[in-house]
Each structure stands twice: as structure tokens, then as C-alpha cells.
Amino acid sequence: MARYCGPKNRIARRFGANIFGRSRNPLLKKPHPPGQHGMQRKKKSDYGLQLEEKQKLKACYGMILEKQLVKAFKEVVHKQGSVTKMFLERFECRLDNMVYRMGFAKTIFAAQQLVAHGHVLVNGKKVDRRSFFLRPGMQVSLKEKSRKLQSVQESLENKDESSLPSYISLDKGNFKGELLMSPEQDQMEAQLPLPVDISVVCEFLSHRT
């Protein structure tokens, strides 16, 4: 599966936040935006603001690809209910993001690697597709051998269970977590490392799908 391989620190500096949860915060060394002397950008147009919100959302979930963004919007735009809530849920409930939220990996990118390399089980069966969509009641666990990975053990050891959103449960001892319910939009937005206007993203995509 295709994935983003570009410079991640530049993206964090662009948005002024350590959005990827790296232990070495790139903003400590270079707190200004990328570009010569962190030059100030010109005032953005409405299109530019929409584009920025879209880029922020993609970054929050581990550099989601454009085609994945468009596909998710097409899947929900004609359904009954809140389009913005269902759209955001498509990314919040991705397997790689749930692995990260549950604390099996320190960063979203480490979570993507765990899934892609076959370390993760869903309801006891191996799933190596990062974009796999979890539904309420589905359990996420790790293979027996994978539980011995130092990176996994360190990540779980440092995971504060009180920081878990209410729609997720975690059993550290058994290396198992569960998606308990469909999250509300405000709950999902609270988990994002920087604020994103989801309605603006959906408006942007509505003109391009």
C-alpha cells in the first residue's frame, strides 16, 4: 500500500505543533515555519484556508493520501446522519490509528508499521491493512511474539490509561484493546493534536468529488 515518505519534521514546523508525537520535538530546534528565516506567508484566500485544513487533517492521521481522503468522503456523503462526523470517523477508527490510540505504538507511523508487518490481530485474526475500518465491539490485540517487541512494551508502559478516550478500552496485561462504541465528533476532535475544521474539509471535498 502506498504511503507518505516525505519530510515529517517540516510538516510539524509548518503547523507549529509536534503533531506526530515524536520524542524529539522538531519545534525545539527550529520553532519557526520552514522556508528562509521562517518567512511569514501572505494572507490566505478562502481556497488556501480550505486547503490548509485538509492538509492538517491528513497530517493528524499519519499523512493520509489524497485518494483515501476522497474515497472516505464519497463513502459517507450520501448517507443519513452527520457527514462531518461519519467522515472523521473513517479516519479515527482506522486500524493504524486505533493501534496508536491504544498505546501499542508511540507514534502513528510506528503503528502503521506494526499493522503493515503483520503484528496486529483484529478479533483474533491477522489484519495487515492499515486502513481497515474498525466497528464497535471489535478487539485489537498483538501476536504472542509481537508482544515481546521492546518498542511495544515501552509504549504500553508509558501509556496513561486515564488519557484513553471513552470509546476505547485497554487491557495492558493481555495486550488487547477494544472499540467500545461509535465515537462522537467532539470526542474525536479532542484527540487531534491540533484543531481542524472538519466542515471546511468536507466543503472543500464536495466541490472536487
UniProtKB/Swiss-Prot annotation:
PROSITE patterns referenced in this protein's UniProt entry, alphabetically: S4
The entry's keywords: Ribonucleoprotein, Ribosomal protein, RNA-binding, rRNA-binding
Region (Disordered): 23-46
Nuclease recorded as keyword: no
InterPro entries the record matches: Ribosomal_uS4, Ribosomal_uS4_bac-type, Ribosomal_uS4_N, S4_RNA-bd, S4_RNA-bd_sf
Listed Pfam families: Ribosomal_S4, S4
SMART domains for this protein: Ribosomal_S4, S4
PANTHER family to which the protein is assigned, alphabetical: 30S 40S RIBOSOMAL PROTEIN, SMALL RIBOSOMAL SUBUNIT PROTEIN US4M
Subunit composition and interactions: Part of the 30S ribosomal subunit. Contacts protein S5. The interaction surface between S4 and S5 is involved in control of translational fidelity.
Family classification: Belongs to the universal ribosomal protein uS4 family.
Protein name in the entry: Small ribosomal subunit protein uS4
Organism this protein belongs to: Chlamydia felis (strain Fe/C-56)
Name of the gene encoding the protein in the UniProt record: rpsD
